[in-house]
Amino acid sequence: MRIALGIEYDGSGYFGWQRQAEVDSVQGQLEQALSKVANEPISLFCAGRTDAGVHATGQVVHFETNAIRNEGAWTLGVNANLPDNIAVRWAKEVDDTFHARFSATARRYRYVIYNHNFRPGILRHGVSHYHGDIDTDKMHVAAQALLGEQDFTSFRAIQCQSKTPFRNVHSVKVTRQGMYVIVDISANAFLHHMVRNIVGSLLEIGLGNQPLTWMADLLALKDRNQAAATAKPNGLYLVDVTYPEQYQLPKLALGPLFMLD
């Protein structure tokens, strides 16, 4: 039996999604909880491996099991065995053609910036703090240069293991809600650190340190060293993964917090 799960987590206390020896990971916690409910070892496959400190409101995973359980066991039962900063939001049996990573047609991330002179207290792990006057209109206009299938070498981490730097960005929006700036970006897939590297460079435009054409210039340069520093991890959320309609997976509000679609 193959089961898909929708997962939400606060990544601030973990060394990323991927299971690692001797450090705490989201995958490790989930596999441990699932194995208790299934009464057998469970191995997970995910839609997107998030880095240390990065969060998710719409992560999707799947696993194989011989255990016969109802959906309540895979949600309430697993949640009872998870720490408070990880939660299963839904569970659904899927056919053998479904794969959390390879069946996905798009991923969507949101990066949340707290734009204020003083750092936040309550949301310090869930937003990135940047002071100074950020012009979101300039950021949004500049970001449109990223649309379409392009070579994103300038926005991939040096240690990125992808065989190709090409990705297809479907949409990118930069908006403001009061003191919060939200960068919302969707693509077929993302390179390692791609979203955070894009945000870091967009911020330079928003702060007036670079011209509107800078994103297009960076794409043409194909040189990571020419772009801005990587934005902090704590403002980044994986909010949605898109799959073909044949799988009929649940669609929940994207989040995080008060963010509107």
From Swiss-Prot:
Entry keyword set: Isomerase, tRNA processing
Purpose: Formation of pseudouridine at positions 38, 39 and 40 in the anticodon stem and loop of transfer RNAs.
Binding residue positions for substrate: Y109
Protein name: tRNA pseudouridine synthase A
Reactions it catalyzes: uridine(38/39/40) in tRNA = pseudouridine(38/39/40) in tRNA
Family, per entry: Belongs to the tRNA pseudouridine synthase TruA family.
MF-aspect GO terms: RNA binding; tRNA pseudouridine(38-40) synthase activity
EC number: 5.4.99.12
Pfam families, alphabetized: PseudoU_synth_1 (PF01416)
Alphabetical list of PANTHER family matching this protein: PSEUDOURIDYLATE SYNTHASE (PTHR11142), TRNA PSEUDOURIDINE SYNTHASE-LIKE 1 (PTHR11142:SF0)
A biological process term (GO) from this entry: tRNA pseudouridine synthesis
Annotated TM spans: none
Record-annotated active site: D51
Primary gene name: truA
Organism the protein comes from: Shewanella sp. (strain ANA-3)
Known partners and oligomeric status: Homodimer.
